[in-house]
Amino acid sequence: MTSQGNKRTTKEGFGDLRFQNVSLLKNRSWPSLSSAKGRCRAVLEPLPDHRRNLAGVPGGEKCNSNNDYEDPEFQLLKAWPSMKILPARPIQESEYADTRYFQDTMEAPLLLPPKASVSTERQTRDVRMTHLEEVDKPTFKDVRSQRFKGFKYTKINKTPLPPPRPAITLPKKYQPLPPAPPEESSAYFAPKPTFPEVQRGPRQRSAKDFSRVLGAEEESHHQTKPESSCPSSNQNTQKSPPAIASSSYMPGKHSIQARDHTGSMQHCPAQRCQAAASHSPRMLPYENTNSEKPDPTKPDEKDVWQNEWYIGEYSRQAVEDVLMKENKDGTFLVRDCSTKSKAEPYVLVVFYGNKVYNVKIRFLESNQQFALGTGLRGNEMFDSVEDIIEHYTYFPILLIDGKDKAARRKQCYLTQPLPLARLLLTQYSSQALHE
């Protein structure tokens, strides 16, 4: 009866487990059978309703073996409703990119089992790999990230590390070059020529030309004059810019010397050569005159000569007589001043009200501009004489009689220049000479 009761109890225990849909946990206790005694141990299975299912033996007997045994997971299930899930731990400093190479030394004691003894770095990596494969999937985010990063780091460590960097030294291409010798630096990097160097160039060339001309004339005529070198220098000055040509004769107030093949010295008077150089700019073509800068202390006469109202150097009486014969208000002319000074180069002659007015045109050297009148009642400045004439064709000019200062001031527009002014003045001058 006892053996049959035991067998029945085991079957009923299995039947109870079949009808209950309970997922068995890992650490479960199965009944252990004892063939010698013929008894069975009670099957202890944790149920969702936290009640133990014990099979009854017929006759009111129970299996009294291991009745005091309690499963540790059964206690864990009782405490499960009171458990709380804490927030994720903060990311450790070793998980940043700049400290990933130190992760092995910082996390290895946490991931390895406590009984593991690591002697070298290679053994640490092997134990870590095997431990990661055995552990189940974690639930927390930080644990998952640690596993992923640790696995990735082990893969990276399998590749050979690059050799250590050598000591920091400047490469040859960045090292400073030794200083070049002064002769080579002056030969390849010559400074820009200045004005004194430009002056020395024509003097050297002119001396060579003098020697060539003198040598050729000695072979042909066997007699040369001291003045023969001056025309050759004049030809050279025509080819060179006028500023350089004039400077070639200025340094020395001494006479220019040239050596011939026999070693004799031929002297050329400096005054004659300077005179030839002074006339050379007028003989130059128009291309070379562009390089010459106008004299800042002398007004430009070329712009004035191109206008029909400029007559040049004539006497005051001759111009006034011609304007009186014309007898038209607003008729005007521009002539050279009789004083021939740089401060007052021109005179504006205007006919108005049966009178002829002579107004001086001043040149201001400080700002290189022109002004009309004495400047006592205004000092309006212009860039050229043409600007003065154009301005007073649209605005009236104030005319004051110097002899009669109490007279009424008059205003007049410049209407027209005197027609055929030069022809009339030449006729007037020829008649005056015959008389």
From Swiss-Prot:
Assigned GO CC terms: mast cell granule; protein-containing complex
Effect recorded for Y96F: Loss of phosphorylation and loss of interaction with PLCG1, PLCG2 and VAV. No effect on the suppression of natural killer cell activation and suppression of interferon-gamma production
Record's comment on post-translational modification: Tyrosine-phosphorylated upon BCR cross-linking. Tyrosine phosphorylation at both Tyr-69 and Tyr-96 are required for BCR-induced calcium response and are essential to restore PLCG2-mediated signaling in BLNK-deficient DT40 cells, but this phosphorylation is dispensable in cells expressing LAT. Interacts with the SH2 domain of PLCG1 via phosphorylated Tyr-96. Tyrosine phosphorylation is increased when complexed with SKAP1 and FYB1.
Annotated region described as Mediates interaction with PLCG1, given as residue ranges: 160-165
UniProt cross-references to SMART domains, sorted A to Z: SH2
GO biological process, one term: immune response
Residue ranges of every copy of the SH2 domain listed in the record: 309-418
Top-level taxonomic group: Eukaryota
Name the record gives this protein: Cytokine-dependent hematopoietic cell linker
Gene source species: Mus musculus
